[in-house]
């Protein structure tokens, strides 16, 4: 009946979502119900589909594609867009061609693409969340053949950083989809072990040989327990040892040096993760349930998710409350790079800013904070091109140096040549010119932290595990060492391969004296080219790995 038309007494029973009325089979919408012209046109299209469904099923229901999209225009942020005035027609017969184009150009193209604009992974694969959701479900229902799975690259390309959920008006979490896919693949033996093998190896190392826990000296329990995580001390031992000195003196805190389980979580290995969490929970209970002090936002997040009963404190918040702590002014001005998992931890963010401000550094806030540096999800091997794109975008977010408070962010930016400092570099005036530790040095740093803590708190001497190839000495150029670190090849693996080749005689010797050997492990095959300089000393010429296991039989 049109605008201001007859409603036949049905307006009070009108459902604005389904456009139904109290009279069966009678629908009502558009201008008659006070809807503006453009929305009336959209309602006409929607109502046609609702009515079609009604005729087929006898029920009025929203089509699946429209369940979450109604009025999504109201979620959109048009900041930065020019407010253009309505184009006035010069002729009563209608717009000229130029006027029509000018009027059409006023349209904001109101399609919600907030996640697309905030997530390189979504943009890289050009798939919006609804499509990804369907593919994840379909993928999980596929048969036994890995080749039938279509989502492999996408599954392992996600940082699982939570940015998509944080910006989505209705909280769609693509990371949770990809996490489900990873767990499902591992459960059904359709995972790609090589994508996570290196970091699972690190996890196993930090939860075994490098693991250490103790209350304060001569105590059996403690009120506070410092949990620095696994990467902080591996990157710089003083990032653990010096804060612990402070916490022990001020709070009589104990310390637990280990891994929260992030590598197992990102690999979808629920059993490995659960075993680690239960071990930590058991230790925590035995120490009379102390408050845990965190220096890593991701550790804090994992514990909050899986052990919510544990009371938490941030190292940086505690330090910010102590006016005697005045960090060194390593930069005149810097941009604050907040880690993705500190997004909802406003107290940790504030604590770091107080410390940086106390140093006299002028802080610049990033336009789009809390985006993953690229490390998250361990997606680097699954999609090197996307990893490079993400890290470049984060590097370029500001031309100023970065202040970070995540060891992984520090590692990524320093590898990419971005000037940056961890807030603990500032607190303890640590020389930023110190070389980025190699993968081998990171393991040595972690063991050095354990050695010093064990001697100090228990009086015992720590003796690292010994291997038959430890006595081998390798000569590696700086350029090659950088390449090996990029390939995630640790010096110890090269030593083992050379030792194994000498024991078995399985190696190739060329006329110029260069030897080539290989070593097959559970999911990787190593290849090494080297020259023997003298007994027990070798010059490495090149090395690489195939992220697959070569079968030597047949």
Label every model-predicted segment:
Residues 37, 45, 49, 313-346, ...:
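Catalytic cores of enzyme domains
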Residues 107-115, 119, 158-164, 168, ...:
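Short cysteine clusters
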Residues 231-314, 343-454:
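Cofactor-cradling patches in redox/metallo enzymes
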Residues 126-307, 444-455:
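Iron-sulfur-cluster electron-transfer modules
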Residues 437-438, 442, 449-554:
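Ribonuclease/tRNase effector modules and their secretory precursors
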Residues 27, 225, 335, 401-403:
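Conserved beta-strand elements of the Class I
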Residues 75-89, 116-136, 166-184, 266-270, ...:
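Iron-sulfur (Fe-S) cluster-binding segments and ferredoxin-like electron-carrier domains
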């Amino acid at each position: 009946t049109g605008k201001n038309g007859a409603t036949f007494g049905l307006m009070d029973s009108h459902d604005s979502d389904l456009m139904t009325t109290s009279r069966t089979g009678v629908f009502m919408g558009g201008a008659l119900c006070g809807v503006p012209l453009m929305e009336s046109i959209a309602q006409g299209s929607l109502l046609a589909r609702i009515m079609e469904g009604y005729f087929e099923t006898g029920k009025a229901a929203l089509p699946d594609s429209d369940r979450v999209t109604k009025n999504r225009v109201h979620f959109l942020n048009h900041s930065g867009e020019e407010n253009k005035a309505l184009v006035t027609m010069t002729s009563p017969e209608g717009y000229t061609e130029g006027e029509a184009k000018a009027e059409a150009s006023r349209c904001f193209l109101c399609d919600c693409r907030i996640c697309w604009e905030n997530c390189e992974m979504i943009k890289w694969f050009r798939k919006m969340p609804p499509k990804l959701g369907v593919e994840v479900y379909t993928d999980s229902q596929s048969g036994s053949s890995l080749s039938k799975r279509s989502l492999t690259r996408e599954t392992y390309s996600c940082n699982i950083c939570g940015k998509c959920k944080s910006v989505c008006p209705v909280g769609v979490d693509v990371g949770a989809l990809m996490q489900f896919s990873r767990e499902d693949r591992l459960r059904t033996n359709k995972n790609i072990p090589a994508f996570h093998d290196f970091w699972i190896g690190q996890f196993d190392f930090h939860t075994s040989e490098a693991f250490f826990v103790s209350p304060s000296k001569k105590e059996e329990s403690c009120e506070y327990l410092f949990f620095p995580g696994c990467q902080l001390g591996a990157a710089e031992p003083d990032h653990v040892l010096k804060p612990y000195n402070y916490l022990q003196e001020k709070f009589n805190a104990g310390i637990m040096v280990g891994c929260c389980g992030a590598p197992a979580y990102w690999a979808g290995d629920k059993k490995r993760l659960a075993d680690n969490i239960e071990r930590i929970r058991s230790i925590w209970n035995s120490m009379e349930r102390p408050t845990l002090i965190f220096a890593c936002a991701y550790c804090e997040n994992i514990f909050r998710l899986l052990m919510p009963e544990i009371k938490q404190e941030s190292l940086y918040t505690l330090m910010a409350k102590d006016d005697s702590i005045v960090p060194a002014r390593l930069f005149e001005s810097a941009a604050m790079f907040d880690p993705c998992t500190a997004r909802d931890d406003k107290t940790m963010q504030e604590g770091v800013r107080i410390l940086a401000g106390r140093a006299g550094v002028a802080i610049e806030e990033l336009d789009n904070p809390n985006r993953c540096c690229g490390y998250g999800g361990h997606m680097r091997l699954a999609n090197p091109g996307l990893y490079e794109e993400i890290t470049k975008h984060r590097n370029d977010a500001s031309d100023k140096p970065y202040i970070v408070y995540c060891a992984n962010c520090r590692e990524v930016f320093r590898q990419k040549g971005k000037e940056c400092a961890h807030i603990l570099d500032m607190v303890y005036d640590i020389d930023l010119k110190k070389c980025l530790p190699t993968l081998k040095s990171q393991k040595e740093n972690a063991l050095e932290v354990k050695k010093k803590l064990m001697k100090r708190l228990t009086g015992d001497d720590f003796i690292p595990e010994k291997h038959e190839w430890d006595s081998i000495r390798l000569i590696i150029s700086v350029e090659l060492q950088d390449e090996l670190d990029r390939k995630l090849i640790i010096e110890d693996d090269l030593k083992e391969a050379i030792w194994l080749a000498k024991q078995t005689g399985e190696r190739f010797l060329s006329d110029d004296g260069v030897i080539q050997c290989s070593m097959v492990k559970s999911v990787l095959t190593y290849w090494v080219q080297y020259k023997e300089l003298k007994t027990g000393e070798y010059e490495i010429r090149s090395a690489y790995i195939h992220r697959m296991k070569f079968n030597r039989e047949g």
